[in-house]
């Protein structure tokens, strides 16, 4: 991942303004520690903090067309860039960067080229010939982007909120799958798949078609000129990512540079479900496995840094981001710059445990659509920013456009969870990789119950967070919560604690509105709470809150006094430590 910042039409082309843009761009330097670039054209500034993944030697940004009349700064990866270059034989390229093709596509097709891009991206393109600009964000918001407006009429775009929040009168999240044009001064949706309008699909389930689509998605993401690995929690999604990567690595260009030995990474409290399952999967696949331990106190000590980097006060996101944030730092210290991860599967296939209660296929499908549309505010935000905080890139094959087209066209009746028929959550995905002759995974891993990342790293992690928050948030503070925080009022002491930290870093009113709110049970949308009357009394985002579904569900339901932080158990804090169970099998260096 890289960091981009653009300031356009600021009515100030002075040296002081240039210095200010450079200062703000440096706030994004953690995202791209390899190179800093800035292009100024009059009162327009395009800056870039580069994490060099493709063509590290010559792919510095901003990038240009042949006569430098078109300038582009990009955060992301374009997996089909070689194919796109072949479609433009008359154009000359300065670098081997996958992102350079964007400038040339604009020359040929104007603003109507974005849907040709296969990848994850946010970009700002300045057309100096016509004195205009366009900005766009990938289909579901894998890469973050914010847009803001200054009192002087300027438009600002930044990979993270911290790049523009102090200088804009108003700012907001740039909507995924959209393009913003200065010519119209408005957004236009460029990503319009059939599932987006929530029409119920009817395609029959074909396990081999689904398997092939996912394998293709993983193979695309092996495009790299730097060392890489996979995040492996031992759950279904990350295990499939690891299994498919291990199976296809040998024939890839990446193997020619870095060898065929795949590295896998896992984090958790000692004895956590994820650590045990991940180690078993790693042994089965033959990966070089790196296991990192953290304590509850390690996580608590990192909370402020996590909220600063993730830029949210959402409870679920912070719970899950903290272990990932700690793990990303250790991964980067090994010389690895890119990892492949399993985000998106639960949204596409209805993998969260509350989907057991979906009353019919129509409600099931509508909820998956709502979840995918909201991914950019939750799991995409976490996966991108928790890793980018340390200059590490995360790629997510489940959110491949072509794979989503296949998966979301399946009749949702096939996705429905029906224990009487032996169909647990994500059955269609499990069945697609249940190969008796050439197995991808052991059966008990392939059919392991869903764990949310914040649960799987160790159940005492969430309990410890609640106990810590209870020490810092009093009952009197909770009584005044609605007056202090009228928007997205925190209803638990844990939520109040995170909100206090967030407001210290991002006090602007616009910042508060970038974070989603509303009731949730086990990561559901507010609409899905209607599926079970009991859920309205136990609104906790943990998967264990799905009463009657999770093997380790809260039983009995937590009293409201505990959910607000009262009477929580004391946590014994151990000396922080991180353990490498497996050392690298090959030398990895930056």
Swiss-Prot record:
Pathway: Amino-acid biosynthesis; L-asparagine biosynthesis; L-asparagine from L-aspartate (L-Gln route): step 1/1
Active site: 2
Domain of life: Eukaryota
Asparagine synthetase domain residues: 193-516
The EC number(s) this enzyme carries: 6.3.5.4
Catalysis: reaction(s): L-aspartate + L-glutamine + ATP + H2O = L-asparagine + L-glutamate + AMP + diphosphate + H(+)
SUPFAM superfamilies given in the database record: Adenine nucleotide alpha hydrolases-like (SSF52402), N-terminal nucleophile aminohydrolases (Ntn hydrolases) (SSF56235)
Binding-site residues for L-glutamine, renumbered to this chain: 50-54, 75-77, 98
Domain Glutamine amidotransferase type-2: 2-185
A GO term, aspect molecular function: asparagine synthase (glutamine-hydrolyzing) activity
Keyword Amino-acid biosynthesis on entry: yes
GO cellular component: cytosol
UniProt-annotated site: Important for beta-aspartyl-AMP intermediate formation, residues: 343
NCBIfam families tied to this protein: asn_synth_AEB, PRK09431.1
Protein name: Asparagine synthetase [glutamine-hydrolyzing]
